[in-house]
């Protein structure tokens, strides 16, 4: 089974009620990250990269798979994206490379007008006093790519 098919199969198996809880979504996303990741050949290099960048963990999930996961989350959220907004903060809090990247993708693509939030304020409130530069740059890049105005 191809990596994309394995991920699609995993996501299709998730119950619809999963989208009612940011905790359950975060747990499911942690399970989804390794799907499609090359075998442990890359393990030592991803460990070193994650450690040097200041992440809590780095599984080596390709960006294209993270984008597929973000698309699935946004599609299945329906009209109410409040759970996804809470998920952004939860993902930042876990401090994994995949979590930060997924949080950036979600934050950039949420309907901020409907949620009544400023994406830059959400980003600022999610960060701690010390963050990996890569994480901040990734979030800023995704927000700008999505057409969000700089503050």
What is the predicted role of each segment?
Residues 1-151:
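Alpha-helical scaffold domains
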């Amino acid at each position: 089974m191809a990596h994309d098919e394995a991920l699609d199969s995993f996501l299709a198996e998730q119950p619809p009620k999963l989208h009612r809880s940011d905790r359950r979504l975060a747990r499911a996303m942690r399970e989804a990250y390794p799907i499609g990741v090359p075998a442990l050949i890359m393990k030592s290099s991803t460990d070193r990269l994650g450690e040097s960048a200041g992440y809590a963990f780095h599984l080596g999930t390709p960006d294209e798979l993270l984008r597929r996961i973000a698309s699935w989350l946004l599609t299945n959220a329906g009209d109410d994206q409040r759970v996804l907004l809470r998920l952004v903060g939860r993902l930042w809090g876990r401090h994994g490379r995949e979590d930060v990247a997924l949080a950036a993708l979600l934050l950039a693509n949420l309907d901020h007008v409907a949620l009544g939030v400023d994406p830059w304020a959400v980003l600022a409130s999610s960060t701690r006093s010390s963050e990996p530069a890569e994480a901040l740059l990734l979030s800023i890049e995704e927000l700008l790519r999505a057409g969000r105005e700089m503050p």
